[in-house]
């Protein structure tokens, strides 16, 4: 099995491909005031393999123009449907390709959501509307999606260099410069000091690169020219996200649009809100220690799949080896669904579309006792759907209270 050091080397070389060894943020951003955005195509000449891999990822293909990319349209426009009241001709571009796909029309120089979304897993149309009182935009944009231009609410994360004044972008989708910052200086004179390498930033700033979009919150600068934004306007990689963005406040014991009672995310795009609550985050783990953002090798862009990823770190103290560790810790046979680390520590919790799920990123085991008290789903009865919380509580009493192994401190 690969150990942690080998995996991190893969991350830093393969995922970022610009160098190893951490540098102060200032050393990497000395040209931030002079560098311009040039687009991902400018990176391809030197980083051919990384570019080609990235080009196949969802990051590079979430936003598509259906006229240029008809294959990107996943919804059924051929058959009439009472939920879908618009035609493909009304669609200026589409968002999404994994859980749901949403459709947007152009009105003036802005884009607006159309009233139905495609549930990709169930292959069905569902209403796309805002439930009254479920998000903080209502006082500023009204309860209807048709009053909400995508510039303030969506486009900053689904593009590179969205200009809030001209409403233009360098490119749609998450391109190289979304994570590495403006690249003109680096393209002209490639050095480590004139481009941001998230892999060599400190853990907080490194995670901020991902959390600029993978978190729910509000810009500190709201409102801007009378508009309220749902992404960190002005933030660039290498800077502190906290100077631009305040994470949504999650209150213990409250069930709501954003959270379960234990503050675990109840909505998509909240991996960062989960992660900052975790021991992993406070131990300096970074998003890209697990995810290869340039890779399309598996569904979640993981460096390794299954238990291999977790046990690269969480297996050092157990002489029993891989199979013994899994069986001892999970009380399930190695190779079974219940023996997967993520089955208990990253359970899939229902998100905004019914029957669609997001993986919790607190890495905390949610006990059936908590389910009994507050109604939050737990991993035990999520798998053993025919059982009750009371059954799961009794079953866990027979387990060891302390894990027989931990990662070394």
For the regions a language model picked out, list residue spans one by one:
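A gly/proline- and charged-residue-enriched helix-loop-helix capping module
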Residues: 132-139, 147-153, 159
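Bacterial N-terminal signal peptides
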Residues: 10-19
């Amino acid at each position: 099995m690969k150990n942690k050091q080998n995996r991190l080397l893969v991350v830093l070389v393969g995922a970022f491909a610009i160098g190893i060894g951490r540098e102060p943020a200032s050393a990497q951003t000395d040209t931030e005031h002079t560098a311009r955005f040039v687009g991902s195509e400018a990176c391809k000449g030197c980083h051919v393999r990384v570019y080609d891999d990235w080009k196949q990822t969802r990051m590079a293909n979430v936003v598509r123009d259906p006229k240029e990319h008809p294959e990107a349209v996943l919804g059924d426009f051929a058959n009439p449907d009472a939920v879908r009241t618009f035609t493909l001709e009304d669609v200026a571009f589409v968002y999404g390709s994994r859980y749901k796909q949403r459709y947007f029309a152009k009105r003036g120089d802005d884009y607006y959501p159309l009233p139905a979304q495609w549930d990709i897993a169930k292959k069905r149309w569902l209403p796309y509307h805002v439930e009254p009182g479920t998000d903080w935009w209502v006082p500023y944009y009204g309860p209807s999606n048709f009053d909400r231009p995508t510039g303030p609410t969506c486009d900053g994360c689904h593009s590179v260099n969205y200009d809030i004044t001209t409403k233009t972008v360098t490119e749609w989708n998450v391109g190289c410069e979304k994570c590495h910052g403006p690249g003109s200086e680096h393209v002209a004179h490639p050095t480590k000091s004139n481009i941001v390498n998230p892999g060599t930033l400190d853990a907080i700033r490194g995670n901020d690169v991902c959390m600029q979009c993978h978190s729910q919150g509000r810009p500190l600068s709201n409102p801007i020219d009378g508009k309220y934004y749902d992404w960190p306007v002005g933030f660039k990689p290498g800077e502190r996200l906290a100077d631009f963005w305040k994470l949504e406040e999650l209150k213990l014991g409250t069930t709501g649009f954003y959270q379960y009672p234990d503050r675990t995310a109840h909505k998509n795009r909240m991996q960062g809100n989960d992660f900052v609550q975790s021991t992993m985050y406070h131990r300096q783990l970074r998003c890209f220690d697990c995810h290869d953002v340039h890779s399309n090798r598996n569904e979640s862009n993981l460096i390794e799949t299954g238990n291999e990823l977790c046990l690269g770190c969480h297996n050092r103290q157990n002489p029993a080896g891989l199979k013994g560790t899994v069986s001892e810790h999970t009380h399930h046979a190695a190779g079974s669904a219940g023996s997967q680390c993520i089955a208990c520590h990253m359970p899939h919790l229902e998100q905004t579309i019914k029957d669609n799920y997001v993986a919790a990123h607190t890495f905390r085991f949610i006990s059936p006792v908590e389910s009994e008290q507050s109604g939050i789903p737990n991993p035990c009865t999520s798998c053993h759907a025919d059982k009750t919380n009371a059954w799961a509580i009794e079953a866990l009493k027979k387990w060891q209270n302390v894990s027989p192994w931990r990662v070394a401190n």
